[in-house]
């Protein structure tokens, strides 16, 4: 089965000279949950923004379900839902209005039935007429997910989806991601937490200083992480192993 996202030799260098991405190559399988693991500043968000067409790569190529994200950007972007890390919403709009408006931005006509389905799936239906400024941080994050799903994308990017949320809401988010995958949505999430990647992902990629240094099936990576090794560096060569 061909990859739904193909990233080939992608690099990004900003005008300051900072190289955020270095020759990244990655294929995302259709229908999988892929976790991109790395510390702050590793390049996770930059890579997402390049794939989504928000940031232009300095080199390389990205295709989304066969559509080049530069020459066929509209078709590529229509397949993608993006949930940013920051809680960026219109505080004075209602939940229903902001989710419906997001659908229209992608050129889709009104579909109250779909919006209702999304809001109910995210436990937002009883908040549909509430202004976003009245919602908790966890509910605002759910609104961002609803906006990302408003135009029925086949790919969903979640940038640090559980950042700043409590343990209970984090587990609710994990279940939501699993439920979305069951509907056929391909999911790519970024995280700092190995336990989050272990809980949800089919495959895990590790990025550091702009380089994708590892891509593994989750089970294989967990097996490797389970092995412990201690290395001692000696100042002088030992002739014999000391007695205990």
Region annotations inferred by a language model:
Residues 60-71, 75-76:
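Conserved ABC transporter NBD signature motif
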């Amino acid at each position: 089965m061909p990859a739904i996202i193909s990233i080939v030799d992608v690099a990004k260098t900003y005008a300051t000279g900072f190289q955020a991405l270095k020759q990244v190559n990655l294929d995302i399988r259709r229908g999988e949950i892929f976790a991109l693991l790395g510390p702050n500043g590793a390049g996770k968000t930059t890579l997402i923004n390049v794939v989504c067409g928000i940031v232009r790569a300095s080199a390389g190529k990205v295709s989304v379900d066969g559509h080049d994200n530069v020459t066929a950007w509209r078709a590529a972007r229509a397949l993608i839902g993006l949930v940013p890390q920051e809680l960026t919403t219109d505080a004075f709009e209602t939940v229903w209005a902001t989710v419906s408006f997001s659908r229209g931005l992608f050129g889709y006509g009104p579909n109250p039935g779909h919006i209702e389905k999304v809001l109910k799936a995210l436990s937002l239906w009883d908040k549909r007429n509430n202004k976003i400024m009245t919602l908790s941080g966890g509910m605002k994050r759910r609104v961002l997910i609803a906006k990302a799903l408003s135009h029925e994308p086949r790919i969903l990017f979640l940038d640090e989806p559980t950042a700043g949320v409590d343990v209970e809401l984090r587990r609710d988010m994990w279940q939501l991601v699993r439920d979305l995958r069951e509907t056929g949505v391909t999911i790519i999430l970024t995280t700092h937490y190995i336990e989050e990647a272990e809980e949800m992902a089919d495959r895990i990629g590790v990025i550091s200083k702009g380089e994708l240094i590892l891509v593994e099936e989750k089970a294989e990576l967990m097996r490797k992480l389970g092995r412990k090794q201690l290395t001692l560096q000696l100042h002088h060569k030992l002739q014999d192993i000391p007695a205990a």
